[in-house]
């Protein structure tokens, strides 16, 4: 399997991108990586780490898409950017997956306009996995589509279901519709229409769920439009970050707290690991005609390595073909 990695995307590019790629080719069998970006910079990082293997190559790209550029314009105008070059490798069949920690908006535009959508899929959705009390959960969509139709949400649910079943090995994952109340009649026109459609599918649909129920692990796939999904995601990240800061402050405020904190250090370490985004790799753009993984902007080497592992599993489990097959089932049932 060949994986295209945007070597210039993210806060720590290209240093930690290269480090993550080296770790991945050493750990995972059957992968070859093409790093796109400024050749001299990437080669210097490989040389620093004394890598002289044949599982990593460089494709030169002189331009970089920054996070403050208009996404669609950047993808269309910066043809010699590291992100576009990586996407084009997948489009041309020279790679089977693309990974970038660069601009989320630009990668979304690239997934749509460079890779294209799977035939029959209305919108590509961003579907991150997050740690829950019982097990990881997915938000679909987490910001790619702020305005949606009910049938889009059904497709998001289907693609999330495929990911859980194929990639994570979870049979019959639960699907919940994010809403302001659990009752069927709650919500706006979008959620009411989506509820009716989801109820008619063969998904394990448990009905409406309130945002507070999501981190409890009450559902595997939380379905919503991108505006709601991104709000839930950012709130969740903010609460988790502040929780650790507040806890640390309280522990350090007294001698008793410091002693208790020292005794509970292994527990806190394990607890913090559950909230470590690097464990999850990245967020897949589901519905694109190619495997596309968005790594966190501040990804370290471990996060890149795990994003590469994630892309490999998606490829091995034939996630694109599985989405196509499941889409056919929806169409047959007029949904």
Curated annotation (Swiss-Prot):
Coiled-coil intervals: none
Entry GO CC: cytoplasm
PANTHER family noted in UniProt: FATTY ACID/PHOSPHOLIPID SYNTHESIS PROTEIN PLSX (PTHR30100), PHOSPHATE ACYLTRANSFERASE (PTHR30100:SF1)
A GO MF label: phosphate:acyl-[acyl carrier protein] acyltransferase activity
Keyword list, A-Z: Cytoplasm, Lipid biosynthesis, Lipid metabolism, Phospholipid biosynthesis, Phospholipid metabolism, Transferase
Reaction catalyzed: a fatty acyl-[ACP] + phosphate = an acyl phosphate + holo-[ACP]
Main location: cytoplasm
Role this protein plays: Catalyzes the reversible formation of acyl-phosphate (acyl-PO(4)) from acyl-[acyl-carrier-protein] (acyl-ACP). This enzyme utilizes acyl-ACP as fatty acyl donor, but not acyl-CoA.
Family named by the database record: Belongs to the PlsX family.
Superkingdom, taxonomy of origin: Bacteria
Subcellular location per the Swiss-Prot or TrEMBL entry: Cytoplasm
Official protein name in the record: Phosphate acyltransferase
Quaternary organization: Homodimer. Probably interacts with PlsY.
């Amino acid at each position: 399997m060949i994986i295209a990695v945007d070597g210039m995307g993210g806060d720590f590019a290209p240093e930690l991108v290269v480090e993550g790629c080296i770790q991945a080719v050493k750990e995972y069998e059957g992968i070859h990586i093409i790093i796109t970006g400024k050749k001299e910079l990437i080669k210097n990082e490989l040389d620093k780490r004394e890598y002289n293997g044949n599982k990593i190559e460089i494709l030169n790209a002189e331009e970089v898409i920054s996070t403050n550029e208009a996404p669609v314009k950047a993808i269309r105008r910066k043809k010699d950017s590291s992100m576009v070059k990586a996407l084009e490798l997948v489009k041309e069949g020279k790679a089977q997956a693309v990974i970038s920690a660069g601009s989320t908006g630009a990668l979304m535009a690239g997934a749509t306009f460079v890779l294209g959508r799977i035939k029959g899929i209305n919108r590509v959705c961003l579907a991150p996995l997050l740690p829950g009390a019982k097990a990881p959960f997915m938000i679909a969509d987490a910001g790619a589509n702020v305005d949606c139709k009910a049938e889009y949400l059904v497709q998001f649910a289907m693609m999330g279901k495929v990911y859980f079943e194929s990639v994570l090995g979870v049979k019959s994952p639960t699907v919940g519709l994010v809403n302001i109340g659990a009752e069927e009649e709650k919500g706006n026109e979008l959620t009411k229409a989506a509820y009716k459609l989801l109820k008619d599918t063969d998904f394990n649909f448990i009905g409406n769920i309130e945002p507070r129920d999501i981190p409890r692990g009450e559902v595997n796939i939380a379905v919503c439009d991108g505006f709601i999904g991104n709000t839930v995601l950012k709130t969740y990240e903010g609460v988790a970050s502040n929780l650790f800061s507040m806890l640390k402050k309280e522990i350090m405020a007294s001698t008793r707290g410091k002693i208790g904190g020292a005794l509970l250090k292994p527990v806190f370490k394990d607890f913090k690991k559950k909230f470590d985004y690097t464990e999850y790799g990245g967020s897949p753009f589901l519905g694109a005609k190619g495997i596309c993984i968005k790594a966190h902007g501040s990804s370290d080497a471990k996060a890149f390595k795990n994003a590469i592992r994630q892309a490999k599993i998606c490829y091995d489990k034939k996630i694109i073909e599985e989405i196509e097959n499941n889409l056919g089932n929806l169409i047959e049932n007029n949904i």
